[in-house]
């Protein structure tokens, strides 16, 4: 079951994202997330709580995703409402490998169609090949790269109907 988040879900969102941060750190995976950047006082500068959706497995929070209709950081040329954007997709390790990422991506695709929007976009670390393969297997097409400070390269992806 996928549920749109509300104020009561903030700690759940933080917990799912923290699980991902710990796993990435343990596996020495380069990423932009850290313990501070997944706290709500930071996230709330960029997201509203209802941008988040939580995936539950047998009543247990397993994963989350943020879906927005504007991304000025990576896609400033796209007017608001012309595309949806996936952010903060994270699956708790105990639920990894069970198709939950794909379930959330498909949820985002259906949400875009429901809103009359024919594209879905995302960004991820250029070096995270396994993550990139997940997105490509879900029909996303590589649309370029963006270099951030500290030579941190992001891969940009788009899915069209």
What are these regions (language model features)?
Residues 91, 97-110, 133-137:
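Conserved acetyl-CoA-binding loop-helix of GNAT-fold acetyltransferases
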Residues 1-11:
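Conserved N-terminal entry element of GNAT/NAT acetyltransferase domains
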Residues 105, 112-124:
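Conserved GNAT acetyl-CoA-binding A-motif
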Residues 12, 103, 130:
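Charged catalytic carboxylate motif
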């Amino acid at each position: 079951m996928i549920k749109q988040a509300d104020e009561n879900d903030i700690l759940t969102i933080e917990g799912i994202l923290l699980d991902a941060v710990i796993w990435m750190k343990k596996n020495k995976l380069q990423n932009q997330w850290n313990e501070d950047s997944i706290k709500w006082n930071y996230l709330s500068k960029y997201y509203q709580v209802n941008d988040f959706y939580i995936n539950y497995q047998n009543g247990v929070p397993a994963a989350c995703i943020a879906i927005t209709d504007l991304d000025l950081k990576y896609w400033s040329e796209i007017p608001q409402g012309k595309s949806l954007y996936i952010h903060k997709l994270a699956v708790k390790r105990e639920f990894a490998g069970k198709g939950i990422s794909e379930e959330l991506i498909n949820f985002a695709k259906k949400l875009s169609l429901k809103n009359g929007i024919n594209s879905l976009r995302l960004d991820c670390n250029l070096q995270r090949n396994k993550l990139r393969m997940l997105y490509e297997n879900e029909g996303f097409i590589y649309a370029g790269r963006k270099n951030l400070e500290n030579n941190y390269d992001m891969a940009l992806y788009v899915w069209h109907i």
